């Protein structure tokens, strides 16, 4: 009887341990897998900028003055005349009607009808422009080559130069609230503001990487991405940055350039880059997991209008939709 009791206890203990390990393995495994699908853009342009106002209405811009627009979540894209053949690098819309595109040679265009027509905006620079950000309908910034920062306080009617203190190309700008924001660029350049963009202060990144993009999950937690896999994190609004660059791995010859980063909430973030790479975090950047990508062409633009759907675009007119789902 004693031997039978011991046997039952041993089996029960083994089952408990097995269930414990099974539960641990399930908890440790990623819970969510994205569905990534190709969309037909009808264009061969290299697409560098993308913005979705909502899950139906979006725009993409790129080489040869290309502007594409969708009103049905990317099922169909139509080409819109931009009035220029300049390379367009970024697009931003304040609402469903008012928007801007920027690009090479100081190109700035604005639309008041949802991107159907575009008019010229004259600025005081011929430098290439790469980034757009507005903190209110009246107050916004453009950033670009040679340390260019342009500011508007009248809704984009007029743009004035601001001192950046650098000659490095500035590629991306983000405002986390009406007082704080960050700019990133070449040669490890990171600038921050704490006075509503009246002035910009250089921060030490301890890197010579070219940063292509910056995004914040909230007012203090942000990420910058760049060439050769550069991945940097701040937890204090941009004053200090920590190198979180992912290891290359045994079969890796060169770290992939990371070109765009977006966070849809405090936990969930996305990165796209060279060779169609898509990375995702569901734990605030503690881990980044590579998602299966249907393309090998570089992805250079990324937009998430909602936590449940996003789009990326890149070389050869590539556009993909990204829809999170359960594993």
Segments predicted by a language model, with ranges:
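Bacterial N-terminal signal peptides that target proteins for export
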Residues: 2-12
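Bacterial N-terminal signal peptides
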Residues: 10-21
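Residue-level hotspots at or immediately adjacent to binding/recognition sites across diverse folds
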Residues: 23-327
